[in-house]
């Protein structure tokens, strides 16, 4: 009888959950919030890297832009940029080269792969150059060569020391032989500066390779390097296939080069400004 029928134990609901509940968005973590350290492979909260961009676990130094390095190195509000507005003539009419340059300029805020000018470091005036690997891997083309050459010529005329932070993937292939001639062009300007008994300090950063290594990067009176910076001419695989030997794991690292006499000292990023200031003072730095 219906009067005494047993009630269901459960309440029946619509099995289609979307009909009564709106789907919740999946939580997302912004890409720029964390980074994986190439050295220790740990995932690091960006804020833990600090302004110096150094891994708190293993001390690996992340690559930084020219403007970031400028802020870490020079006295506040002392930098005056020079030699801007120089543009390549695109000698090979390389496909899409000018479009690529325009895009990279917009992305980096730089006109080329090297930032040049004068600045004070610990109160001492220097001619300063900082290469930026974010700009087509800081490859050396005609404009990079011209800016660095003019920097040395200016420093020679004004009797200033030169401090140059190097970083490069080598010569800029889009400019062919014109890029290669920059090696000799800059080296000649370095030689004139040296003949005037003026101080030239290079700071090798990751990566410094190719024609930059084969010329002005290794011509400094003192050659500094950041720890674990990759410094070399040809690539590791190219060398191994040529000599048919397995190279050491630390081959082309700054520490390996120091052991073999190619680098004078290795300095942690946090100590570079102080160390550069000391070296300038020892070599008769001019206070402004």
What is each residue range found by the language model?
Residues 21-28, 39-46:
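Short, intrinsically disordered, charge-biased short linear motifs at domain edges
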Residues 71-125, 131-136:
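Extended interfacial segments that mediate partner engagement and assembly in macromolecular machines
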Residues 34, 52:
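Residues immediately within or flanking Cys/His clusters that coordinate Zn2+
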Residues 1-25:
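N-terminal alpha-helical interaction blocks
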Residues 46-50, 63-69:
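Short Cys/His-rich "knuckle" micro-motifs
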Residues 115-194, 201:
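Cleft-lining beta-strand/loop regions that shape enzyme active-site pockets
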Residues 37-40, 55-58:
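Short cysteine-rich clusters marking metal-coordination/redox-active sites
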Residues 169-288:
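Conserved catalytic cores of soluble enzyme domains
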């Amino acid at each position: 009888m219906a009067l005494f029928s047993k009630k269901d134990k459960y309440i029946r609901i619509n099995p289609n959950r979307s009909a009564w509940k709106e789907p919740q968005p999946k939580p997302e973590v912004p890409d720029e919030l964390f980074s994986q350290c190439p050295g220790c492979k740990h995932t690091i909260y960006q804020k833990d890297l600090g302004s110096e961009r150094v891994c708190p676990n293993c001390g690996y130094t992340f690559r930084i832009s020219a403007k970031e390095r400028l802020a870490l190195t020079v006295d506040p509000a002392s930098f005056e940029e020079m030699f801007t507005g120089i543009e390549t003539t695109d000698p090979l009419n390389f496909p899409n080269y000018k479009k690529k340059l325009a895009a990279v300029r917009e992305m980096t805020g730089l006109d080329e792969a090297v930032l040049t000018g004068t600045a004070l470091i610990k109160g001492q005036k220097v001619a300063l150059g900082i290469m930026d690997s974010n700009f087509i891997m800081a490859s050396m083309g005609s404009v990079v060569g011209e800016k660095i050459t003019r920097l040395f010529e200016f420093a020679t005329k004004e009797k200033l020391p030169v401090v140059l932070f190097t970083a490069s993937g080598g010569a800029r292939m889009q400019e062919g032989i014109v890029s290669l001639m920059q090696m000799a062009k800059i080296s000649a300007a370095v030689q004139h500066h040296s003949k005037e008994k003026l101080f030239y300090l290079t700071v090798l950063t990751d990566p410094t390779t190719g024609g930059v290594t084969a010329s002005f990067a290794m011509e400094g009176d003192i050659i500094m390097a950041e720890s674990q910076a990759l410094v070399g001419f040809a690539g590791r695989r190219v060398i191994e296939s040529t000599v048919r030997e397995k190279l050491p794991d630390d081959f082309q690292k700054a520490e390996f080069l120091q052991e073999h006499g190619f680098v004078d000292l290795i300095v942690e990023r946090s100590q570079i400004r102080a160390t550069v200031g000391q070296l300038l003072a020892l070599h008769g730095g001019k206070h402004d």
